[in-house]
Curated annotation (Swiss-Prot):
UniProt KW keywords: DNA-binding, Transcription, Transcription regulation
HAMAP family named in the record: TFE_arch
NCBIfam families: PRK06266.1, transcription factor E
Pfam families (alphabetical): TFIIE_alpha (PF02002)
Gene: tfe
Subunit structure: Monomer. Interaction with RNA polymerase subunits RpoF and RpoE is necessary for Tfe stimulatory transcription activity. Able to interact with Tbp and RNA polymerase in the absence of DNA promoter. Interacts both with the preinitiation and elongation complexes.
Residue span(s) of domain HTH TFE/IIEalpha-type: 3-88
Name the record gives this protein: Transcription factor E
Homology family: Belongs to the TFE family.
GO annotation, biological process: regulation of DNA-templated transcription; transcription initiation at RNA polymerase II promoter
Length: 175
């Protein structure tokens, strides 16, 4: 399941783009129950970094923990375990959000005329360009009509890809 690029991307976002998170997940999957201290030692990563990743995963409900109090020291020990059965639903939800955003962007591209400042590389709607007299508000340069056919084509490709994933990928077919 973790080999799926869409799942990897969502997990990467959840873990604030920290690649160590995948190592943490691997340790959790391979040991099934482990303390944050043991993960830190196994990966040779600072304990606070391991805890930060575990908390992010916990917020997404992808890990669970048990807390036990040491009666001698009064310290708590947290034992973490993976809870990856929620991954497909989480990825499907994020994919739907992305898909909706792409569809909104496609509608915007298809229903508007755009202008472009080649110096600043900024794209403006016709209304915004007209309001500024077809001069770039950043640099004052002339704006030129922008052909967004490639943008529309790219958006359609991305939408089709995600829709295909929903229908063809068995991980997401239930969502």
């Amino acid at each position: 399941m973790l080999e799926n690029p869409l799942i990897q991307q969502v997990l990467f976002e959840i873990m604030d783009e920290d690649v160590v998170g995948f190592d943490v997940l691997s340790v959790l999957i391979n040991t099934n129950e482990v303390t944050d201290d043991e993960i830190s030692r196994q990966l040779d990563v600072k304990l606070n970094n391991i805890r930060r990743i575990l908390y992010k995963l916990y917020e997404a409900r992808l890990v669970d923990y048990n807390r036990e109090k040491d009666e001698e020291t009064n310290w708590y020990t947290y034992t973490w375990k993976p809870s990856l059965e929620k991954v497909p639903a989480l990825v499907a939800k994020k994919m739907k959000n992305v898909l909706n955003g792409l569809k909104e962007q496609l509608e915007m591209e298809e229903t508007n005329m755009f202008f472009f400042c080649s110096d600043c590389e900024i794209k403006f709607t016709f209304e915004d360009a007209m309001d500024s007299g077809f001069r770039c508000p950043q640099c004052g340069g002339m704006m030129y009509e922008y052909d967004n056919k490639k943008d529309i084509s790219l958006l359609k490709e991305q939408i089709n890809y995600l829709e295909d994933e929903f229908t063809k990928n068995p991980l997401f077919s239930a969502y």
